[in-house]
A protein has these predicted regions:
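Peripheral, non-transmembrane regulatory/ligand-interaction domains of membrane transport proteins
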Residues: 1-184
Length: 184
């Protein structure tokens, strides 16, 4: 789904109908037609779109010298809902932030907390006209998510440790190992 946002003269994030100078384009789970729009209508380098949607990508920065476009891939943490484990486990998935001449684009292969927070308009001083500041706010949101999940992992780890000291059963060791895997 493609959504278009722009900060108005009062500093309020508003949804707009189309791409315009100083806007933010949010692409969440874009279908083939939407991907084609990003590439042909907006001129985004096709490799940047593909990389942003590749679940195996890790964090990196790339610049296309011909177009001047900059791609920043950042991994964000997410609870692993597909895990068969009884305990909460975590994975990381990429979100692509593409800096274009007149706007900024985020591309994600699934809905995520970071983009939802940005779209909600609740982020203080979010201004789509200032691409670097926008990117820094995305990075801040992601780092805050990591810290929140690390606190949860620490809490679970402490609880399991306490049970482990009392029981010394294999089940507790397995839980501890599963938590440890989330930290990798």
């Amino acid at each position: 789904m493609l959504s278009f946002y722009k900060t108005d003269e009062n500093g309020v994030l508003c949804q707009v109908d189309k791409v315009c100078r100083g806007c933010w384009v949010s692409a969440v789970e874009p279908d083939e037609k939407e991907q084609a729009f990003l590439q042909t209508e907006m001129g985004i380098v096709p490799e940047f779109v593909r990389a942003s949607l590749d679940a195996q990508e890790t964090s990196y920065i790339d610049k296309n010298e011909e177009t001047g476009q900059i791609l920043v891939i950042v991994d964000y943490p997410e609870q692993d809902h597909e895990s068969a484990r009884k305990m909460t486990s975590y994975i990381t998935l990429p979100v692509g932030v593409i800096l274009l001449e007149g706007c900024i684009v985020t591309i994600a292969n699934q809905s995520n907390t970071t983009v939802e927070m940005l779209e909600s308009g609740k982020i203080k001083d979010l201004d789509t006209r200032y691409k670097t500041r926008f990117l820094l706010q995305v990075l801040l949101l992601i780092s805050q998510e990591y810290l929140a999940y690390l606190r949860q992992i620490e809490k679970q780890s402490t609880q399991i440790e306490q049970r482990l000291y009392k029981s010394m059963k294999n089940r507790e060791l397995i839980h501890m190992l599963e938590l440890d895997k989330s930290l990798v």
